[in-house]
Swiss-Prot record:
Uppermost EC category: transferase
This protein's record includes keyword 4Fe-4S: no
Catalyzed reactions per annotation: UMP + diphosphate = 5-phospho-alpha-D-ribose 1-diphosphate + uracil
Family the entry assigns: Belongs to the purine/pyrimidine phosphoribosyltransferase family. PyrR subfamily.
GO MF term (any one): uracil phosphoribosyltransferase activity
Species lineage: Bacteria, Bacillati, Actinomycetota, Actinomycetes, Micrococcales
Organism of origin: Leifsonia xyli subsp. xyli (strain CTCB07)
Listed name of the protein: Bifunctional protein PyrR
CDD domains tied to this protein: PRTases_typeI
Function in brief: Regulates the transcription of the pyrimidine nucleotide (pyr) operon in response to exogenous pyrimidines.
Its EC number(s): 2.4.2.9
Length: 183
């Protein structure tokens, strides 16, 4: 297996700052905004984006709000029988999502199936005004008509390659790597 680093800590930091600015511009501030990470690394990513948004808004207008939460999609996945996954994680919302713009956050967008499950889970929790998607890496190979609104890095890859996102909070370091020849 050959592993190569495609994003390092500084690259990830710049991408998250850009995504944060794009979310703020799209939403015209933090009013009515909820950022929900999909466990595990999507939650870390959502927290970082929310912290960045809070810093930007605090500097710009002195605004601050609790806007981040986690959305577990385990029981909404369509591949549970074929692919047993981790134990369900708690879902935590920053408040009611009705009428808000919800930004779903995940580390890698691949087939689109995780996001489809997230949309199903979200519909059981309320009726947002709009739903957007932010991902650190979009690697292509979609099986469903889903696209990200905010992307850190478009990283076309072969289906045989595996992309790993690592965050200091979970893995001890920040990096995005591609492992060639994995299935």
């Amino acid at each position: 297996m050959v592993t190569r680093v495609v994003l390092q800590q500084a690259d990830i930091s710049r991408a998250l700052t850009r995504i944060s600015h794009e979310i703020l511009e799209s939403n015209r501030g933090i009013d009515g905004l909820a950022i929900l990470g999909i466990p595990t690394r999507g939650v870390v990513l959502a927290r970082r984006i929310a912290e960045s948004i809070q810093r930007i808004e605090q500097e710009a207008v002195g605004a601050s709000a609790d806007i981040v939460g986690a959305l577990d999609v385990t029981m909404y996945r369509d591949d549970l029988a074929r692919n047993p996954t981790r134990a369900p994680q708690p879902t935590s919302l920053p408040g009611p999502i009705d009428g808000k713009t919800v930004v779903l956050v995940d580390d890698v967008l691949f087939s689109g199936r995780t996001i489809r499950a997230a949309l199903d889970a979200l519909s059981d929790l309320g009726r947002p005004r709009a739903v957007r998607l932010a991902v650190l890496v979009d690697r292509g190979h979609r099986e469903l008509p889903i696209r990200a609104d905010f992307v850190g890095k478009n990283l076309p890859s072969a289906a045989s390659e595996r992309i790993f996102v690592r965050f200091a909070e979970v893995d001890g370091q920040d990096a995005v790597t591609i492992e060639e020849g994995g299935a």
